[in-house]
Design a protein with these regions (language model features):
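Pyridoxal 5′-phosphate
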Residues: 1-402
Length: 402
């Protein structure tokens, strides 16, 4: 079926938090949650659950929730459900996989990280390399455009892994992950991609990206707070993580420590189903996800243009970064005001647009913003033109000279 246009009014009706009258531009830190997701979480908690098994209804219900969540994430990311791993957070999963992957590293080996990334895709690799005696190579970016430098400037035949973001949570930059993956694979390096900030804004396909590992966080796309990693089951079979002796050696379960949060996994499935229904009625959920996310991308691009044009026309406002491909995330400063002052003034106007480095500390420093960062405004499918205009009015009327 052809993609339908996004209907903001219909979408907004599913989010109780929007009834508070706040314009939420803090989606890059975590989206608001629609009613079907909250109901799925509550339903799982109250329906009767046990540890996974096949004897009782409660055991089978838990098993079905896990199986369903893996299938849902696979449909979202274009992955194999047998390669979907759940964890407490994307940060925790990356630390776990860094520890596992680095067991084979040693002096002379190299790891590439970028200054564009969230620290969750930097520090785990830096620490793992230090423990192994391997060398960390830094891939920089242009502080004016926020575009990554060429990977070949730091890649060598000794590179074991390249860690890169699919979209900067601070500046919105969308690097060419496929080109990076292809280049890294030429020297047999693995590619670990942070897709946390991309997944809420664009159709995603693991094979198209060419990455070996792709992580994301459901709470950024209307779901509960946990982390997800997708990889080839065959690749996961080659890895031996730390685990308890009685726990299964099966993939992907052997990477999941302890009992899974079944209620949160039920929420993940509901979030993917919600996304799939945003702008498509195709019979297959993967097709619905792709069509709906294409509609999301188109809708958000229009609001992004409005926001960029509006902020760019206000005296005293500086926009940071001008990447060629980007998510609908804008970082800006106001002359004579600290980021915190802007954040507080916007909050008084009913606009949630926080100020920080947002854990992209290396990127903030490279962009000349130090450890303070700047104000970040992120657009979501429930954002409206009225929300954008409200932010622009607050900046223009309350934060800049008359």
């Amino acid at each position: 079926m052809p993609t339908n246009a996004l209907d903001p009014a219909r979408i907004r009706a599913a989010f109780p938090a929007l009834d508070l009258g706040v314009a939420y531009f803090d989606g890059p830190g975590g989206s608001q949650v629609p009613t079907p997701v909250a109901e799925a979480v509550a339903g799982a908690l109250t329906a009767g659950l046990s540890n996974r098994g096949t004897v009782t209804d409660a055991e089978r219900r838990a098993d079905d929730i896990v199986t369903g969540a893996r299938a849902a994430v696979a449909d979202l990311l274009g992955a194999d459900p047998r390669g979907v791993v759940f964890g407490r957070s994307m940060t925790q999963l990356t630390f776990d996989f860094a520890r596992t992957l680095s067991r084979g590293w040693g002096p002379g080996d190299e790891v590439v990280v970028t200054r564009l990334d969230h620290d969750a895709n930097i520090r785990p690799w830096v620490l793992a390399a230090e423990r192994a005696g391997a060398t960390v190579r830094w891939l920089d970016f242009d502080p004016d455009t926020a575009e990554l430098d060429d990977l070949e400037t730091v890649l060598t035949t000794r590179t074991r892994l390249v860690a890169v973001t699919a979209a900067s949570n601070l500046l919105g930059t969308r690097p060419d992950v496929r080109a990076i993956s292809d280049t890294a694979h030429e020297v047999d390096a693995l590619v670990y991609v942070d897709g946390v900030h991309l997944a809420p804004h664009s159709p995603v396909d693991l094979a198209t990206l060419g990455a070996d590992f792709l992580g994301c966080s459901p709470y950024k796309f209307f779901g509960p707070h946990l982390g997800v990693l997708a990889a080839s089951p065959a690749l996961l079979e080659t890895l031996t993580p730390d685990k308890l002796l009685p726990s299964t050696d099966a993939v992907p379960e052997r990477f999941e420590l302890g009992t899974l949060p079944y209620e949160l996994l039920a929420g993940v499935t509901a979030a993917v189903d919600f996304i799939a229904g945003l702008a498509s009625d195709a019979p297959d959920r993967r097709a619905r996800v792709l069509e709906s996310m294409a509609a999301v991308e188109e809708y958000e691009a229009g609001l992004l243009d409005r926001l960029l044009d509006g902020l760019g026309a206000i005296d005293g406002v500086t926009l940071h970064g001008r990447p060629a491909r980007r998510t609908p995330t804008v970082l800006f400063s106001v002359a004579g005001r600290t980021g915190l002052e802007v954040y507080e003034e916007l909050a008084r106007a009913g606009v949630n647009a926080p100020a920080s480095h947002f854990y992209a500390l290396e990127a903030s420093r490279r962009a000349g913003l130090g450890d303070d960062g700047a104000v970040r405004a992120g657009i979501a499918p429930y954002t409206t033109t009225e929300d954008v205009d409200r932010l622009l009015r607050a900046v223009s009327q309350k934060l800049t000279p008359a």
